[in-house]
Regions:
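Conserved beta-strand in the GNAT
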Residues: 61, 67-76, 92, 97
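Conserved acetyl-CoA-binding loop-helix of GNAT-fold acetyltransferases
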Residues: 95-98, 104-117, 140, 144
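Conserved GNAT acetyl-CoA-binding A-motif
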Residues: 119-130
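Conserved acetyl-CoA-binding loop of GNAT-fold acetyltransferases
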Residues: 124, 143-152
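Conserved beta-strand-loop-alpha-helix junction that forms the acyl-donor binding cleft
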Residues: 128-138, 155-160
Length: 161
């Protein structure tokens, strides 16, 4: 049985959100020290409040016993179209993070499902996100949730010949 609830994020969640973001960023920096800076705080209070004030935010937290256990942040936006792409409205998930002690309990799946509901209600035709290749656990979660690869972005390290 679930002891957690999914709710909208509020300004008072900032410290817990910042801790989750730092945890997530540290994992990225550890996996790709060549790419990510160490010790950087992803969200300032101003950035967090800007997300909450976005015209169509996805700003969700999972809470258990008064503590924030996970988050899902993003927004719904319109792409005007261009020479190649049709105009469309889509949801972009920027962050989906769960504290390690809460992983494997369905929290991230529930956060993603609620984000999907919000996206549909806002008229989005798709829900999109980016994931790093090293984050295999997240990739499995996304595939299980029904997300499919849209495109591949590849890199070649040019520093060593």
């Amino acid at each position: 049985m679930e002891n957690w609830v999914i709710r909208g994020a509020v300004p008072e969640d900032f410290e817990a959100v910042q801790a989750l973001e730092n945890l997530d960023f540290s994992a990225h920096a550890q996996a790709r020290p060549d790419y990510f800076r160490e010790g950087q705080v992803l969200y300032s209070r101003q950035e967090y409040e800007a997300l909450l004030a976005h015209p169509c935010p996805i700003a969700l937290v999972a809470e258990e016993a008064g503590a924030v256990a996970g988050l899902c942040f993003g927004f719904v936006t319109d792409h005007p179209g261009d020479a190649f792409c049709k105009p469309r409205r889509f949801a972009l998930i920027q962050d989906l993070v769960t504290l390690p002690e809460y992983r494997g309990r369905g929290i991230a799946t529930a956060l993603l499902a609620r984000a999907r509901e919000q996206a549909v209600q806002a008229g989005a035709v798709s829900l999109e996100l980016c994931a790093w290749a090293f984050n295999e656990r997240a990739l499995r979660l996304y595939e299980k949730a029904g997300l499919k690869v849209q495109y591949y972005r590849m890199e070649m390290d040019l520093r060593n010949g």
